[in-house]
Amino acid sequence: MTKPIFLNAVLQEKIWGGIKLHTLFNFTLPSDKTGEAWIISAHPNGISTIKSPAEFAGLGLDELYKTHPKLFNEQQLASFPLLIKLLDASDDLSIQVHPDDEYALEHEGEYGKNECWYVVQAEPGAKIVYGHTAMTPEEFAEKIDNEAWSDLFTEVPVKAGDFFDVPSGTIHAIGGGIVILETQQNSDTTYRVYDYNRTDDAGNPRPLHIQQTKDVTTIPHSVPTTNQQVVTTDTGTRTTFVENKFFTVWKYDINGDYSDALSSTYHLVTVLDGKGTLTVDGTQYPIQKADSFILPSGTPTLQINGSVQLIVSQSNQ
C-alpha cells in the first residue's frame, strides 16, 4: 500500500533571520533570528525526520532513502538529491554564489548548488540581488578588488508570486523583507563575496570567499530561459516554473476536487496555504499550510480536495 511520507522540519538560526516562519507557518522557533526551515532535507547539516507513516516514524530522511529505495524510484544516487527550504530574510542575506558540481566535488567534497526561489511574501520595496554587470573576468575581479559593489551587483524588485531560477555561478542575495520557498540541490556550499561588514556572535567578521567567487561566477551574467507553462481546469491550475537536468518545479493552486497525473518518480510537496484532503491509494490524509510530504514513486496521481496552494518538485537526476 502506497502512503505519503510526512516530515518534520529542521529550524536553522541565521544572523539575518526573523520570526515569520512562526507567524506565517506556525513553526516553533529556536529564537527570533530563525532564518530557515529545512522542510525536506537529508543533508547532514539538518536532516528531516519522518512524522508518518508510523512504520518509518523517527527515521531520518537520509536513512529512509538508503534503506527503502523502492520508495524513491530505485534510485542509487549516493545521497538524496534535493533540499527544500523556507527562508525568512528579516535582513539582507550576504551576496553570494554557489559552485557547480565539478568545482564543488573537487574543492568541497559535495555537490554544487543549483537552486530556484518562489516568493511567498515580500514587503513593499523589497529587492533581491540577481546577477552582476561585469562583462569579463578582469572587470569582475577589478570591481571586487576595488569594492565597487554598487556598480557590480544588479538589484531586482520582487513581489509575492515571483519565481527566479538561480543556477550555479549566479551572483545572488535575498533582500530583507522577503520570504521564499527554495528548491535546490542537496548541498550547503556557499561562497560569500560581500556581507555588509557583519560580525558573528564573537565579534569576528564573517568569512568571505573572494577567490572562490572569482573562480565560479558566470561571466557575463546569464539569465536562464524560462518557459512557464500553465494548465487550468475547473478546480485547479498547475504552473510549471522550471524543468532542467536537476529538478522540475510546479505550483498548484487548487480549489475543489482536483486530480493530476504524476510521472512514475517520487514527488516532494509543500503546502504553502490552505487546507484540504489528500487521497493516496484510497486513503484520505488531512493536509494544511506548512505540511511537507513525499509522494513515493508509483503514486499515480496528485488527488486533493480542498483549497490549497502547493509547491511540488521532482529530481531529474
What residue ranges belong to the model's regions?
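Short, structured beta-strand/loop micro-motifs enriched in basic residues and often containing a Trp
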Residues: 142-150, 273-277
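Short acidic-glycine-tyrosine-enriched beta hairpin
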Residues: 152-165, 179, 281-299
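Ligand-binding loop in jelly-roll beta-barrel domains
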Residues: 79, 87-92, 101, 122-125, ...
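His/acidic/aromatic-lined binding-pocket segments of jelly-roll/cupin-type domains
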Residues: 84-85, 93, 109, 115-118, ...
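An exposed, glycine/acidic-rich loop-and-rim segment of catalytic or binding clefts
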Residues: 146-152, 163-165, 171-222
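Transition-metal
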Residues: 1-135, 195-224, 249, 317
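Acidic/His-leaning functional-site neighborhoods
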Residues: 228-291
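Short beta-strand/loop turn elements enriched in aromatics
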Residues: 119-140, 238-240, 254-265
